[in-house]
Amino acid sequence: MTNIRKTHPLAKIINNSFIDLPAPSNISAWWNFGSLLGICLILQILTGLFLAMHYTSDTATAFSSVTHICRDVNYGWIIRYMHANGASMFFICLFLHVGRGLYYGSYMYPETWNIGIILLFAVMATAFMGYVLPWGQMSFWGATVITNLLSAIPYIGTSLVEWIWGGFSVDKATLTRFFAFHFILPFIVLALAAVHLLFLHETGSNNPSGIPSDSDKIPFHPYYTIKDILGALFLILALMMLVLFSPDLLGDPDNYIPANPLNTPPHIKPEWYFLFAYAILRSIPNKLGGVLALVFSILVLAIVPLLHTSKQRGMMFRPLSQCLFWLLVADLLTLTWIGGQPVEHPFITIGQLASILYFAILLILMPAISIIENNLLKW
């Protein structure tokens, strides 16, 4: 008799995706982040669901309802901080996942890669709208500044911004619709993640060597299920350390001040995971130019596969490209730091140089170095 997991229509899908899936025998811990992102997403949906049961999306009561969750709801404080810091863990995993893709040439699966870019945009949109919901000072002013960027679009910009706001400023209508979008988007992300997996399973996973591994596959279960569980334990450990010891470490103290349209905070800045893009936005003195650079800072990932000039897939055997990759990582860390600094000398210049370097590495230096490496192979 055939095993039910191989015959039942629903169980068969799960079986072919997580149990009998043929996987390369040499994938490292860098391949753990897909499953960790799945765990992050489910954790965010669950904690978010329980928060939504007590939250009110009204300007008069939003701030108080979050305080009420932390003070009066059973274990409300831990749910709230798990949700807030869960977002940070989500983005840490996202950045490492994308970095892995860049390093090992996983972008050579164009469908999987492009769905991944759409997923990144969707998660960023979700996080931005979630940050507005507590209706603190940084929530309000962050929403005002970021939505205002759309006014840089020629001709329709101003009308578009007022349409998104539902009025002439960020107000009650804006908060209500942001809550609605923040609730629905994670489910869209979930569906996109399923499509992401679907495309990945069409080709199979890449591996650190970048060499096809069809001749050397092992079943996903038990080898990679146990490895994923270990990764999940580390993720939960890191999250709970953050939640229980320093829950406000990554947040902004200004968000504990209720939103006040009459009082602008001295430094308006987004959450840490958007700072690199915010620094790129601020480094261009022109509004439309800044907005385009901001969008392109993520969209540039879509061009990476087209600029792959190397004869090898990954960077495992390409020391020059490796140096360039780690320079890119250092540059992104620099941009993140600059994004949190005030707009004054020397930060302006550092930000501009780091922004130029970011695009130069991805669009010019990487393809050029790859061609040099190809020629070095002939010697």
From Swiss-Prot:
Compartment(s): Mitochondrion inner membrane
Main location: mitochondrion
Gene Ontology biological process: mitochondrial electron transport, ubiquinol to cytochrome c
Molecular-function GO term, any one: metal ion binding
Residues annotated as binding heme b b562: H83, H182
Binding site for heme b b566: H97, H196
Cofactor(s) demanded: heme b
UniProt keyword list: Electron transport, Heme, Iron, Membrane, Metal-binding, Mitochondrion, Mitochondrion inner membrane, Respiratory chain, Transmembrane, Transmembrane helix, Transport, Ubiquinone
Alphabetical list of SUPFAM superfamilies matching this protein: a domain/subunit of cytochrome bc1 complex (Ubiquinol-cytochrome c reductase), Transmembrane di-heme cytochromes
Residue sites binding a ubiquinone per the record: H201
Similarity annotation: Belongs to the cytochrome b family.
Note: Heme 1 (or BL or b562) is low-potential and absorbs at about 562 nm, and heme 2 (or BH or b566) is high-potential and absorbs at about 566 nm.
Name of the protein described by the UniProt record: Cytochrome b
Gene designation per UniProt: MT-CYB
